[in-house]
UniProtKB/Swiss-Prot annotation:
Binds 1 zinc ion per subunit. One of its GO terms (cellular component) is cytoplasm. GTP binds at T112, K113, H114, D115, G164, Q165, S166, G167, V168, G169, K170, S171, T172. PROSITE patterns: ENGC_GTPASE, G_CP. It is found in: Cytoplasm. One of several proteins that assist in the late maturation steps of the functional core of the 30S ribosomal subunit. Helps release RbfA from mature subunits. May play a role in the assembly of ribosomal proteins into the subunit. Circularly permuted GTPase that catalyzes slow GTP hydrolysis, GTPase activity is stimulated by the 30S ribosomal subunit. Its main location: cytoplasm. GO terms for molecular function: GTP binding; GTPase activity; metal ion binding; rRNA binding. Zn(2+) binds at C245, C250, H252, C258. Its EC number is 3.6.1.-. Monomer. Associates with 30S ribosomal subunit, binds 16S rRNA. This is Small ribosomal subunit biogenesis GTPase RsgA. Keywords: Cytoplasm, GTP-binding, Hydrolase, Metal-binding, Nucleotide-binding, Ribosome biogenesis, RNA-binding, rRNA-binding, Zinc.
Length: 291
C-alpha cells in the first residue's frame, strides 16, 4: 500500500503523486456505496496494480474542503484581483473573503495587471488595500515585469489554490511562473468586464514546497452553505468589534447598542465593508427556503 496526494481528476481517473511519481488510480466500490467521492487534494492510501495503476482504499481526514470546485487540504487561498480589465472591486473581494473564511481557508490577496493601471488608479487601490492589510490580510501587487518566483516564495508551503473571477490573469500568472504549463488564456469581454474561464478541471502543479492550482467555476460565488447568523463571523473586523455589542446574538443590522454600527459611524470600520456585509446579509435572508 502506498500513500500520496490526488493531483488530478479526469474521467473518473485519479492521478496520485507519491514523491514525484504519478499513479493512475480509481476508488474501490465501497466509496460508491458510502456515496463518498475522493477529490483533488485528498491524501489517500492506494494499492498498486500494473506498476503505475491502482485502487484507492482509504481517504485521510480532510483539514478543509472547497465545495466548488471540489479541492481539499488547502494551505492558502490566493484571491486574485486585477487592478483593471476587469476593474478592481472591493465588493467582489469581500465576497471571496467570506467564501474563504466559511471554508476555514487562509486567504491572501494578489492584485494583478499593476502595470496596466494608471498612477491614479493604483494609488486609489493601494489606499483601499491598506484597509485590508490593517485587518490582517497579506497582499501583493504584480505586473508583467514582476518576479513571479519571488512572489510565490512568500506564500505558504503546501497546497496553494488560486481563486478569482475569470479574466483577472490566473492562467497568465501560472504560465509566467511555470512557462512549461502553456495554459490557455482568454481576453476579457469589454462589454461584460470579465472573461471566460479557460481552466476546465482542477489540477495541482508542482512548485517549490508543494503544489499550486487554478480553480474553474470559482467565479460563480455560492453562499448557500452560509446562514445569515454566521455571516458576521466571516467579516473579521466586524466579528472582532461585535464582541463588544450589548447583545451576544447581535447581527449588527437593527439591534440597539450595536458596537459595530458605532464604529462605522466613527469611521473605524469602513462604510463600504459594512455596506457589503448588509448587502450579503439581506441576500442570504431573502433566499428561498431549501428543502
Amino acid at each position: 500500500m502506498k500513500t500520496g496526494r490526488i493531483v488530478k481528476l479526469i474521467s473518473g481517473v485519479y492521478q496520485v503523486d507519491v514523491e514525484g511519481e504519478r499513479f493512475d488510480t480509481k476508488p474501490r466500490g465501497l466509496f460508491r456505496k458510502k456515496k463518498f467521492s475522493p477529490v483533488v487534494g485528498d491524501i489517500v492510501d492506494f494499492e498498486v496494480q500494473n506498476t503505475k495503476e491502482g485502487y484507492i482504499h482509504h481517504v485521510h481526514d480532510r483539514n478543509n474542503e472547497l465545495k466548488r470546485p471540489p479541492v481539499s487540504n488547502i494551505d492558502e487561498l490566493v484571491i486574485v484581483m486585477s487592478a483593471v480589465e476587469p476593474e478592481f472591486s472591493t465588493q467582489l473581494l469581500d465576497r471571496y473573503l467570506v467564501i474563504a473564511h466559511s471554508y476555514h481557508l487562509k486567504p491572501r490577496i494578489l492584485i494583478t495587471k499593476h502595470d496596466l493601471a494608471s498612477e491614479q488608479e493604483i494609488l486609489k487601490i493601494k489606499d483601499t488595500i491598506k484597509i485590508y492589510q490593517k485587518i490582517g490580510y497579506a497582499t501583493q501587487f504584480i505586473g508583467k515585469d514582476s518576479n513571479y518566483t519571488a512572489t510565490v516564495d512568500e506564500w505558504s508551503d503546501g497546497l496553494i489554490v488560486l481563486s478569482g473571477q475569470s479574466g483577472v490573469g490566473k492562467s497568465t500568472f501560472l504560465n509566467s511562473y511555470q512557462p512549461q504549463l502553456k495554459l490557455e488564456t482568454n481576453d476579457i469581454s469589454k462589454s461584460l468586464n470579465r472573461g471566460k474561464h479557460t481552466t476546465r478541471h482542477v489540477e495541482l502543479y508542482d512548485r517549490k514546497g508543494g503544489y499550486i492550482a487554478d480553480t474553474p467555476g470559482f467565479s460563480a460565488l455560492d453562499f448557500n452553505h452560509i446562514e445569515k447568523e454566521q455571516l458576521k463571523d466571516f467579516f473579521i473586523d466586524i466579528h472582532e468589534a461585535g464582541e463588544q455589542c450589548k447583545f451576544r446574538n447581535c447581527n449588527h443590522i437593527k439591534e440597539p447598542q450595536c458596537h459595530v454600527k458605532a464604529l462605522v459611524e466613527k469611521g473605524e470600520i469602513p462604510q463600504f465593508r459594512y455596506d457589503h456585509y448588509q448587502q450579503l446579509y439581506n441576500e442570504i435572508s431573502n433566499r428561498k427556503v431549501r428543502y
